[in-house]
Amino acid sequence: GNVVPDTKERNHLISLYSNTMQSVALSHGIPFIDLYNASQKLYQQDKDTSYTINGIHLTAEGYVKLAPSILPDSLFAPLPKNALLEKIRHEVLEKNDTFFDWYRTVNSFYIHGDRRNPYGTVNFPLERKKLLQMTSVRDHRIWKVARGEKIPAEVDDSSTVKIPSTIPGKRGGTSPALTPAQEKAKFEITEGYQVELFASEEEFPELRNPVSINFDGAGRLWVATMPSYPHALPGIKANDKILILEDTDQDGKADKRTIFAKNLYLPLGFEFGKNGIYVSQEPNLVFLEDTDGDSKADKETILLHGFGSEDCHHAIHNFVWGPGGGLYMQESVFHNTQVETIYGPRRSKDNAIYRFDPRTHRLEIASRLPPGGNPWGYAINQWGEHLYVGRHNNASLINQPESGNVANANYGNRDNRNCGQEFISSRHWPDELQGKVFSNQYKNFQGVLIHDWTEKGTTYDHKRLGKVFEAQNKACIPVDLQLGPEGALYVADWYNPVLGHMQYSLRDERRDSSKGRIWRVTWKDRPLDKPAKIVGATVEELLDLLKAYEDRNRYRARRALWNLSDETLQPALNRWVSSLDPANLNYPLHLM
């Protein structure tokens, strides 16, 4: 269960502040709203309902209940409690959403910051002007509704500045778009490997610009799509999605699609939690919950607010659970983060690795090293060592985030872009590959590489061992990868003729948000692994999976165990730990 700080001492301090503020306000004849006592009264009336997320930030129901205290009739004219008020509220929310896109915009470093020139001056002036005009249109609708006037059901933005839907592209470097079959035909595949298409936009039109993938305990592949990248255009609602793809007949191809969540905006990363997923929704960390078990999100909770949004592809992402139960996530250059937590503000500039504990809502900055951009790829090995991408040349680094002990991967060409990393821990792959690392690269090489990190004293030696496959097509942009429950490697292919962020116009006619592929890589002459039973497994079966050879089996079993209640887990865990043999060489690993 959730464990937040003891509220008794804190409430005593708040009451002292509240009473003093009230006394000073009354002595000066200043109106005072006593939210402390109002909230205490509410909580005592209904102790079974959570009116806050974490003890200080209200839920939607909490705002509804406390609204009369926040806006008392003694200070404000009473609001009508009828259908008119709901109509006004609808229009206000529409206006607020539009204005939010203007004042808390993503990619603000390209609008107000150092990259305003040369990119922002081309991309944003008309877009920003149109957003303000759209806000004004919606503001006028609010006043008309308040006066009792009839308004059209649809907002009319015809009076706002006209912007061509697309513009001709001038910058070079793009590639022609190919069908999945045409793309695969150009792959150069190293002997021994086999690459097949698992899913594409042809079978699943919603599979557009996949950016992050993750397998759940049932063996289903979850995919975050991001066709709104790099920036939603004024008047076009973002509709990024979280998809669930299934291979129900076990033929190596997806044949079923479920939309877990839609109407998202730039879900750069996600990770599983209890009955839902944690999702990046800059400037927020959001939890999307499935409360009725139908594999569709029906509840959204903003857990943390205030993460940077200055560059949309550097926002919080690379979500991965550490062995200690913390959710790690990475943020990059240009960003300024100020998150209010129940333990005080957490601030960071330009780069950070965060660790979030969902039980206590504690957010910690685990590391500010290394500074740099494009940190796409994060993996933790069986001993809890962190391998992540960082620095402008996208060298991989391995250490504990809290330490300064960092090893760099040295390339002949420093302008590489790694994107996604996965330790090889599956008996489906040859013995000589065990412990090595699969890694995507999408610039100066499009495909999957193999790296070797070998311990050397207190740091690591790095070798690039070769390639799995090379696309020979710059529109192939591998952005994430993960070993599936059967040991196959799944690769998310963003697939876009335009490889770049703001270097190309937002409305460049060559941008293509309609495509996306998932590739499945196997070794020809070795059997696949037998998928571990996670869903429906007993506590004892899950605990035994902590001894499994495969990192991913242990990872997924650990998540299932964390979701159990203490009453269910603790007795079985105590018995299991007692049964371990301290003489076993893997004894420390089993305890992790």
Question: Over which residues does each language-model region extend?
Answer:
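Conserved catalytic region of serine esterases and O-acyltransferases that act on ester linkages
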Residues: 27, 50-176
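Short inter-helical turns and helix N-cap capping residues of alpha-solenoid HEAT/ARM repeat scaffolds
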Residues: 549-550, 580-584
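Sec-exported extracytoplasmic/periplasmic mature domains
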Residues: 22-27, 44, 68-76, 247, ...
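Amphipathic alpha-helical scaffolding segments comprising HEAT/armadillo-like alpha-solenoid repeats
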Residues: 535-544, 566-580
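Beta-propeller domains with acidic blade repeats across secreted/periplasmic ectodomains
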Residues: 159-547, 552-563
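Substrate-gating cap/lid alpha-helix
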Residues: 2-35
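Residue-level detector of extended alpha-helical repeat arrays and alpha-solenoid scaffolds
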Residues: 553-554, 584-588
